[in-house]
Amino acid sequence: MANVVVVGAQWGDEGKGKIVDWLSEQADIVVRFQGGHNAGHTLVINGATYKLALLPSGVLRSGKLSVIGNGVVFDPQAFLDEVGKLQAQGLIISPDNLRVAENVTLILPLHRELDALRESSNTGTAIGTTRRGIGPAYEDKVGRRAIRLMDLADLDTLPHKIDRLLAHHNALRRGLGLELIDGAEILRELTAVAPKLLPYAETVWRLLDIKRREGKRLLFEGAQGALLDVDHGTYPYVTSSNTVAAQAATGAGLGPGAIGYVLGLCKAYTTRVGQGPFPTEQDNETGRKIGERGREFGTNTGRPRRCGWFDAVLVRQAVRTCGINGLALTKLDILDGFDTIEVCTGYRLDGKEIDHFPAGEGAQARVEPIYETIEGWKQPTANARSWADLPAQAIKYVRRIEELVGCPIALLSTSPEREDTILVQNPFEA
């Protein structure tokens, strides 16, 4: 029996929510281990649409325990809002089926304000974030001045922790000519919200260790994608956390032995939100056609996603940096009807062919994709639930992707619906 990690193998938005929801039927516990409420999922279940940003997808299934790990940055108001909306849709969410790491870092209003300031300034600091305070909160975490969930339970030490936090932020704000923040106001806000949050607080590493020893199946749910990893992604156009599979252990308080199988998610094409290099981007009618068919708009932000052809080089790189055992290929149906489909198999950089994506920002901007043209298919793949339902040419496309990225396809998704999934290899039984 393998504990399974699900990670994005592109720039996020690969359809992790649906796949995690589909796999969660076999899991006992679903764990979020990094990121914040900047990465959204849209799930369609029995015709009902659910939008998640911070909560694990396990909350959509009864009888499952969902956990937010210590690697996440946690916005109290966003959490309460999301819980409230899902409860209004009839879901039962309580401390009985949702636990939050007591040592999770909190996102405060000052983090959101700083994030927005950087994105709107003309100083060259904008990189296309969601302005939700994710990066500034992680900065405070590694700077050892963050407020954590457990701090709300100790009102004797909380004022001192707020003062320590503001010693940094007010110095920064003073230099930027901004109004200074009153620590008493932060204290009032946190004191007011504490009774609503603390019932969810848990020593997560201990809880998960106990459950593992009891033989419970764990499903780790990543946010964003490997190409947004702060170390291995398209730096500086990345998120502020490690998004690769190894972070599942760190972000949940478990050792690497807790990971048994890594499932990577990728679309049958490529999308990206925000700024940064995108070698196969199609800023043309093809890109617009893919975007319209795939409804490529951010779940949280509504921003249109940039669209392009499948990049086998980048996905192959993600397979290596994440230790991916199998891929779940999503949105194959969006390519239905194309006469031909392009797949990037390599790059040219300054006249030379290379087989990997360079780390340097300048080199990333100069790479040119080398394409292989593949014949398309006319028959629909939408709603297919077995290989027999797929056109022969679509199967050839899937097999060619396997060859190019050096990794087998374990799952194939053909619509947003939970059941429109073709299983090749069950990750929990691998």
From Swiss-Prot:
Binds 1 Mg(2+) ion per subunit. Residues 277-297 are annotated as: Disordered. Substrate binds at residues 299-305. The keyword Magnesium applies. The active site is at 13 (proton acceptor), 41 (proton donor). It is found in: Cytoplasm. Pfam families: Adenylsucc_synt. Mg(2+) binds at residues 13, 40. Pathway: Purine metabolism; AMP biosynthesis via de novo pathway; AMP from IMP: step 1/2. GTP binds at residues 12-18, 40-42, 305, 331-333, 413-415. It catalyses: IMP + L-aspartate + GTP = N(6)-(1,2-dicarboxyethyl)-AMP + GDP + phosphate + 2 H(+). Its cofactor is Mg(2+). The keyword Amino-acid biosynthesis does not apply. SMART domains: Adenylsucc_synt. Residues 285-296 have a biased composition (Basic and acidic residues). One of its GO terms (molecular function) is GTP binding. Its main location: cytoplasm. GO terms for biological process: 'de novo' AMP biosynthetic process; IMP metabolic process. Keywords: Cytoplasm, GTP-binding, Ligase, Magnesium, Metal-binding, Nucleotide-binding, Purine biosynthesis. Plays an important role in the de novo pathway of purine nucleotide biosynthesis. Catalyzes the first committed step in the biosynthesis of AMP from IMP. Belongs to the adenylosuccinate synthetase family. Homodimer. PANTHER family: ADENYLOSUCCINATE SYNTHETASE. NCBIfam families: PRK01117.1, purA. This is Adenylosuccinate synthetase. It comes from Bradyrhizobium sp. (strain ORS 278). The gene is purA.
